[in-house]
Amino acid sequence: MNSNSLLSAFRLFRVKREERPLATVMLLVFLALDALVICKYYDVFTPQTTYYWHLFISKFHISGFDPITYSVVSNWTAGYNVYRHPLLAFFMYVPYLINQGLIWLTGINCAIFIVSAIQLFAAFYSMIFLYRICREVVGVSRTDSTLATVFYFGFAFIMLSTMVPDHFVI
C-alpha cells in the first residue's frame, strides 16, 4: 500500500463543508449525552479497585445495557463472550493499555473517559456516514439528508447507544 492510497483512506474521515453545520450540532449533542453518563458515574467508577467487574455490574443502572466495556478496559479479561464477539475483547486491548498508563499517571480509573472517546468517535462518524449515504448514494437533497439523519439519531435506542458503555455503537 503506497502513501497515496493511505491518504485517500484517511480522506474518508474529512468532514465536508456541507456536513459541517450538522456535524457541529450533532457533535455537541453526543458530547452532552456522554457528559451525562460521565457526571452520573464519575464518583463511582473512577476510584481504583481490585474487582472492577462487581463494581460496574452492581452500580451501573441504565436498563437494557451493561457496562462490560468499562470492566474490560479497566481489567482486560475475557469479559465479553468471545464466541458471540470474537474481536471485541481484542479491540479493547489498546484502550486497556491506555487506561493502565492513565491510571499510573493520574491515580484514577479513566475507563469512562476512554470508552466515551471511542463512542464519541463512532457515533460522530456513523452520523457522517449515514448523511453521506442519504446524500450521495440514495441521492436525496441536503435538507432531506439532514432530516433523515437527525430523525434516525432522535430514536431513543440510538441515542442511548451513543452514550452507554455497551458495544452497540462501537
Residues of each region from the PLM?
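Short hydrophobic/aromatic helix or loop-helix immediately within or flanking a transmembrane segment
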Residues: 77-109
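Short acidic/glycine- and proline-prone juxtamembrane loop motifs at membrane-interface regions
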Residues: 163-169
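Transmembrane-helix signature of polytopic, membrane-embedded enzymes
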Residues: 130-154
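Transmembrane signal-anchor helices characteristic of membrane glycosylation enzymes that use polyprenol
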Residues: 14-76
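Membrane-water interface at transmembrane helix exits
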Residues: 38-42, 96, 100, 131-139
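Membrane-interfacial, low-structure loops and terminal tails that flank and connect transmembrane helices
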Residues: 1-18
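Loop-to-helix entry region of an early transmembrane alpha helix in multi-pass inner-membrane enzymes
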Residues: 102-128
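Specific aromatic-rich, kink-prone transmembrane helix
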Residues: 158, 170
